[in-house]
């Protein structure tokens, strides 16, 4: 059987440059109409028991070259169990080594979350008691912008994920959060649904997800730089969601992401927005502190530098939503690399840990739910 490489499937991304026996030289393809690239996902067939060397030759030109040192690629032979494999970054090239036990092996930047799995998730959750579904609009490629709703309370809670499609851990987080929220035997879920109304977007960027992009939608727009002035022509995904937020109000919002370079889980807030409300900021810090005490997978030491007062970029979701609605707003970041605080030499940061973090984040939200504002009022 001849060794072949293919990425012509949902979320796939790779270009074969040259093959020299079991050493294959590859390039990651740029996002459409963009210079961003780092996400890869492809399959190798016909290489059973062969020691593969897969060399990504353009790694140094990727969006975040600091993401490659100490990184290990993910591999699976059944597309269910994803493990890390020997990977090194040297002279601007990323080399992945693996010996398949069967004739099919899949390699990815992180465990993929396919659009088929997304549709399965939406259908499974929409069929549960008390869960509603709304299509808030369509993407540039015509895909539905899927929103799940639940809860009877007055506080408006928004959870959004995967503005950057290559950050697949964000939708794994969503799967864990949704499974907990819809568990009728879970007291945390019951409390939250009693006290709040949830609006949940598991995938903000379906086009980029399907196309195998790292950070952009179909036309090359970075959705997390579109929240100040979204347009139907460039970023309908953001425009439709923000328009709906204008109708529902936003009291608490978490925007879920992955970070290429920082091997930790952390939160970023909105301290640089104009006219920062100290009580609003205090609630964010309280949430962050409680989460750090609750799970060893979260920490407060590593993360992004704070914006100077009044200097926040209001094109980012967290800043815009905190400013626009006086919401307790935050960005959650998870690593592509292994997790330095609690390393796992076999899987690294994984879908399973992402899902568990989704459950844990809800536990802290339940602790604080009575302290949150209602429609931007009553900050305490």
From Swiss-Prot:
InterPro entries per record: Cytosolic_carboxypeptidase, Pepdidase_M14_N, Peptidase_M14
Top-level taxon of the source organism: Bacteria
Listed cofactors: Zn(2+)
Alphabetical list of SUPFAM superfamilies matching this protein: Zn-dependent exopeptidases
Disulfide links within the chain: none
A Pfam cross-reference name: Pepdidase_M14_N
Coiled-coil intervals, chain numbering: none
GO biological process: proteolysis
PROSITE patterns registered for this protein in UniProt: PEPTIDASE_M14
GO molecular function, one term: metallocarboxypeptidase activity
Residues the entry annotates as binding Zn(2+): 164, 167, 257
Domain called Peptidase M14: residue spans: 111-369
Active site: 333
Protein name: Uncharacterized protein ZMO1242
Species annotation: Zymomonas mobilis subsp. mobilis (strain ATCC 31821 / ZM4 / CP4)
């Amino acid at each position: 059987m001849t060794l072949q490489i293919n990425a012509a499937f949902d979320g796939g991304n790779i270009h074969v440059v040259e093959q020299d026996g079991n050493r294959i030289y590859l390039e990651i393809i740029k996002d459409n109409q963009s210079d961003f690239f780092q996400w890869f996902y492809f399959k190798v067939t016909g290489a059973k028991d062969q020691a593969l060397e897969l060399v990504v030759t353009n790694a140094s030109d990727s969006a975040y070259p600091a993401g490659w040192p100490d990184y290990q690629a993910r591999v699976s032979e059944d597309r269910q169990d994803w493990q890390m494999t020997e990977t090194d970054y040297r002279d601007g090239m990323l080399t992945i080594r693996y010996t398949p036990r069967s004739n099919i092996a899949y390699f990815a930047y992180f465990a993929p979350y396919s659009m088929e799995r997304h549709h399965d998730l939406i259908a499974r959750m929409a069929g549960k008691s008390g869960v509603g579904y709304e299509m808030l609009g369509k993407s540039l490629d015509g895909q539905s912008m899927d929103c799940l709703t639940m809860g009877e309370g007055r506080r408006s809670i928004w959870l959004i994920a995967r503005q950057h499609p290559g950050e697949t851990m964000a939708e794994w987080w969503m799967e864990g959060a949704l499974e907990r929220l819809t568990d009728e035997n879970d007291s945390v879920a019951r409390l939250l649904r009693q006290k709040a109304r949830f609006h949940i977007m598991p995938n903000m960027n379906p086009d980029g997800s399907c196309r195998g992009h790292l950070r952009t939608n179909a036309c090359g727009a970075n959705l997390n730089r579109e929240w100040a002035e979204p347009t139907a022509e460039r970023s309908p995904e953001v425009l439709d969601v923000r328009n709906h937020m204008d109708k529902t109000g936003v009291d608490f919002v978490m925007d879920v992401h992955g970070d290429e370079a920082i091997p930790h889980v952390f939160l970023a807030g909105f301290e640089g927005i104009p006219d920062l409300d100290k009580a609003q900021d205090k609630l964010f810090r309280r949430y962050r502190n409680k989460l750090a005490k609750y799970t060893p997978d979260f920490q407060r030491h590593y993360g992004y530098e704070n914006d100077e007062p009044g200097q926040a970029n209001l094109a980012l979701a967290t800043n815009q939503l905190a400013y626009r609605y006086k919401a307790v707003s935050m960005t959650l970041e998870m690593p592509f690399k292994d997790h330095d605080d609690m390393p796992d030499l076999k899987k690294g940061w994984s879908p399973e840990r992402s899902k568990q973090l989704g459950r844990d984040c809800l536990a802290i939200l339940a602790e604080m739910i009575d302290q949150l504002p209602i429609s931007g009022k009553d900050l305490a």
